[in-house]
């Protein structure tokens, strides 16, 4: 679950981290009023969306008069911002963050992720702030410095100082950086984060460190113990189908093809999509109904797939282990009957109660194409689409 920049900065401020003073605005009038509250003669207006690359797409603007701030808000509020990290529709802008401009002397990068290979939180810092860290890692990896957090001892001040020295910081900037590091590490652990990025972490001409930008991603599997963060989740930034699927514990990701896929198990789902592509078709989605699929969830999965107008056929591939194939068959029959399916449906059932499940589908009288293997199913679905 992603947070907006302004939400991340509110969490930062509560923990004593240095952030620019700013106001979240929902109208052009509020944006102009924010300049009066902030004072000064230079402000930064930022569209709040769950995507990077805002600046290159016109979603961030440096303004030298209140009218420019107001015009920027008028231009973007209620519109969609398209960046290299969004799809072609972009993401809706409902908030504008207006901040006093910062007098920047140097830009740094500071971030943290969970390193799967070591099962530890790893902090990364670089002098190459303000640019995409992926490009730095590709072209100049020696400029990225890392420290690993031991889960038993937690973050240590010496680790913050170590990073500061590697960045070439001196004097009071070392202690400032170390304190920021410690507070961020505690935030990462307390809020069950999966990703934290400050890009850039700037040094002002007065030698003060400020978190100029903020990006936080919360581990979705830990939201049950983060009720406060769950409440501020902005579902408008997600694909509507994906958000709806999450309510039914379905793992759904929209894609660009026209073959709807419903599978149990993430690995099998990816393998199914590969087979669909191998035989000349394109998957419209990734959808994992999970090991505890019920008739109701299967019915809902069909509805979600069919809400995509691009879908011309549906492939159901179920390997029954925990899940029973006959229950999946009940869900398929109920969904086809309820929705009034007008497109081809290819079903492959294997494993737990596969034969009773196949018999239910056969006896239903519905136009469902049976497949006896994944290869057969992929060929059938590709042929069905070509015939339409």
UniProtKB/Swiss-Prot annotation:
It catalyses: succinate + ATP + CoA = succinyl-CoA + ADP + phosphate; GTP + succinate + CoA = succinyl-CoA + GDP + phosphate. GO terms for cellular component: cytosol; succinate-CoA ligase complex. This is Succinate--CoA ligase [ADP-forming] subunit beta. The lineage of its organism: Bacteria, Pseudomonadati, Pseudomonadota, Gammaproteobacteria, Enterobacterales. One of its GO terms (molecular function) is succinate-CoA ligase (GDP-forming) activity. GO terms for biological process: succinyl-CoA metabolic process; tricarboxylic acid cycle. The keyword RNA-binding does not apply. It comes from Hamiltonella defensa subsp. Acyrthosiphon pisum (strain 5AT). Pfam families: ATP-grasp_2, Ligase_CoA. NCBIfam families: PRK00696.1, sucCoAbeta.
